[in-house]
Amino acid sequence: MTFDAADSPTALPLAQVTPDRFDAGEATPAAVLSGEVPASQAAHPLSIFDMFRIGIGPSSSHTVGPMRAGLAFTGELASLLAGDEGDEAASTPQRSPEEGAESKAPCRIMIDLFGSLGATGRGHNTDRAVLLGLAGYSPESVEIDTVEGIFPTIAATGFLPTPCGQVPFDIARDIRFVPRTVLKYHVNALTITAWREADGHEKILEHTYYSVGGGFVMVQTNDDVDNPQVASLATGMSAATIDAPAPFLFTTSARLLHECKQSGLRISELVRRNEEAVRTAQEVDEYLDAIADTMFECVDAGTSASGILPGGLDVPRRAKALSTKLSERARTGCESLPGAPWASSPDDPMRAMDWVNLFALAVNEENAAGHRIVTAPTNGAAGVIPAVLGYLVSYCPEAGATIGAASAPALFDSPEAPLARVRFGSKGVEVLSDASDIRGEAWARRRKAVHDFLLAATAVGSLIKTNASIAGAEVGCQGEVGSAAAMAAAGLAEALGGTPEQVENAAEIAMEHSLGLTCDPIAGLVQIPCIERNAIAAVKAINAARMALWSDGRHTVSLDAVIETMRQTGNDMLSKYKETSAGGLAVNVVEC
């Protein structure tokens, strides 16, 4: 079974972690801070198909997860009703809602959103997401027009279209926000109930789901509110890894480094071996390409769109205007453009930072608009990894270059090739300078670097999710943007030729200096401070990678220790700083 943070025993504080405190058969993540867990007892690492998922904004825990819950519910409901009437054809949840059988439709469906989902669900479009799932749409493939049209459709017709048929639905009556009720298992909980009769008699199906961050969903399997039992909701391609063997098992960075040392593999190579144990190399590469392409397309879309972001804060999009200014400055160095005369000119040694900021802003503005993005590892932190990937393919490095003690792969054909200024497109990057050609063999090398980046980032993301959390509602923004920064730093260090120890160090630096970040979105929208915070974190990740690459990999604080510290810090953090919009900026900034 794919290991999920929710499946692990509760980790102990650092002072309590000793090998003799755990049963021999347990692979408690925190235990290995003081010793190794045998590979036979270790959990299956999360896959790239788990850590990077294509979905829609603005939140992985409050939008993508609830949408998956709705889709799972409508699929089970369709199967149940099909069994009642002997019609097996009704058991396919992915078919078009228009194909539902009217006679089999329930007379009422109710949705209850608890805890953080109830507190910030309107700003995160949680209600809309659940309805889209119930209508049979998946976050990976739903069209944006469909997303924006679900509320008007229900309001105009009074019905929710589902694979089971048209269900009478009143948005104000049948969706209840219950922020003051926090269920025991997780703060992000929702219950969906289907009734055969409109007056609430004869319940057909009811499930409680927990959206635990990053689009991961757990479903409660019993009715005990005080002792809930849950199972992972496997959806899509990630389901293929359940119970699948993995040649390299690790739940900690200590074990990961041990496996790398024993095998002689780099982190990206080790993760690839695990992936190819259950899929072909072509399938792995195609998925990595799809993830990278979607990230690039998101940057391209964000730099092409203007206007005001939805939600009522009247936050203007900035990426398009910034892209225009930077592109013009890169071409001409024109001093009449807005901004300091030297900024991002060919002579500006910090010009890469402006482009990294642009890439992050573009992605997170798309996310805030509810458009398609890659959960990396969450939607609220979706701009960090694409921005650092942009730095990799735009500014790192010339052939034969070295950074610190690491020997970087050659990404350009010519050792004299200058740093390229680029914009992203559906086919990758478009260079704004004629001095560098990234096609042909150079692009093949660049593609491998991108793949290595994502594979190494997956390893770090798996460690964080396994041992702590990537959900802002559990541990604050340190678990979202902090995790993304650690993943991006590790990916960049790997792509630039870092040793496993340097890669681990890069991730540790980025996470250590993200500790304590609160999640306090104004008006419950993933806009302020989220959009700018992604840009800051992307630059931090680059700095962390560069610092690590100048070292020999030896450092005082381990990645395992900083992940456990992040978990403890999140546990100690007041709930008003964990995606409830009840503290911090959310109460000190006027919503206008």
Regions found by a protein language model. Name each.
Residues A6-P38, A82-E102, A399-A444:
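Intrinsically disordered, low-complexity terminal tails and inter-domain linkers enriched
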Residues S61-A78, P386-E398, W443, A489-G497:
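Alpha-helical support elements that line or immediately flank enzyme active sites
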Residues F52-A72, G370-V388, V475-A486:
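Conserved phosphate/anionic-ligand binding catalytic regions in large, soluble enzymes, centered on
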Residues L113, A485, A490-C592:
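Functionally critical mobile loop/hinge segments
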Residues S138-W342, M353-W355:
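C-terminal regulatory domains involved in ligand/effector binding and gene-expression control
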Residues G83-D87, G100-G115, T402-G404, A410-D413, ...:
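Beta-strand segments within the central parallel beta-sheet cores of soluble alpha/beta enzyme folds
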Residues A281-I403, V431, I438-G476, G584-C592:
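Accessory "access/gating" subregions that flank catalytic or transport cores
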Residues A82-E88, G100-P106, I144, D285, ...:
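Flexible, glycine/charged-enriched surface loops at secondary-structure junctions
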